UniProtKB/Swiss-Prot annotation:
Protein name, as recorded: Outer kinetochore KNL1 complex subunit KRE28
Main location (coarse class): nucleus
Assembly description: Component of the KNL1/SPC105 complex composed of SPC105 and KRE28. Part of the ten-subunit outer kinetochore KMN network that includes the KNL1, MIS12 and NDC80 complexes.
Signal peptide coordinates: none
Amino acid sequence: MADDPTINGLELQLNAAEEHATALTEEALQNQDLHYKEVVEQLKRSVEQLVEDNESLFTAVDLPPEVDPTCISGRILDLAQLTQQLKSTHLQQETLDNFLRYTISSTDILQLESESDERYASVSRAVSQLQDNDIIQLDSEVDQIKQDIRKAGQTIADQREALNELCLETGNLADECHTLLSELEEATRTREMVEKQAAVEVTNDHPVEEMYASWQSLKEELQQESHLRRHLNQLKQSKASLEAILGTKNGNEHKDTNVMQEYASYDAFIRFWISKFTNKEMENLEVFPRSNKFQFTHRGTDVVISLGPRGISRVELYGKGIPLEKIAAARKDVNEEASRGEELYMSINRIIDKIKEHTTVS
């Protein structure tokens, strides 16, 4: 896997989408399977109830030792026709029974002499009217409901089919995305290899640039050496002054009042700096009152600051904390910050921030 944040992010998003699509597909298949099982169970119960209600119509038949699958479809059609006939007969009998039970008194049946009897004719006309109007209307409504049910069932079936196709298409798209992601990783690796090879070729084909870089490095080393020599001389002077002060304190000779006052002033000055201007990220703070300079270390970089009448007049940077190709820009940035004329503490903070932008040592 290429260590590219874009590719890694795409892979995470693709895996999450694939897991979500898989969960939805499994849920849809489970719902469809449950629906089919319920339909089969309902049909089974209906057939069993139909057989039980019409058991007298069926005669026992000796089952053959082997079942011929080719006759199943014909038997299903016969059973469907028989079911429709039974429904029709049952409805006719129930309708006639209810009609005779609630419309004609049992005492009047025996008094009907013939079909030409006025009462029979009246009832016949009423039945015909009921059949022509109400029953036809009800049959039409029933047919419409059946048609609506068929349409709704077909719509549900179409939606399930579309859902299955969508799940399958989503899986195919996920596979294509994985393939494209692999191709992107391969292209990224190839590009990185080409860039590295090109960088090597450029380095090999440009000895002048290498020589210039070596010269810049040597120049920086010389500046660093000069800085260290100046620092060493300052330390030697400080050591000599301290030895003189200690010799004056511990000896029996007359005390040098000027040296003692200078030491006390120097010590008070250092303490004042530490309490007022020191940033917590500054290390190895040293103050040189005679030369109006102070220096400290931050992230492997020695920072030498020269003070003038209006604040910081110059900032020098030395050390290995800043790469050679960035040292010139870093020196320019810190001196621009120093020239803004802000308070000393704020200027030091801004200089430290600029050093952070260029250093490689944390």
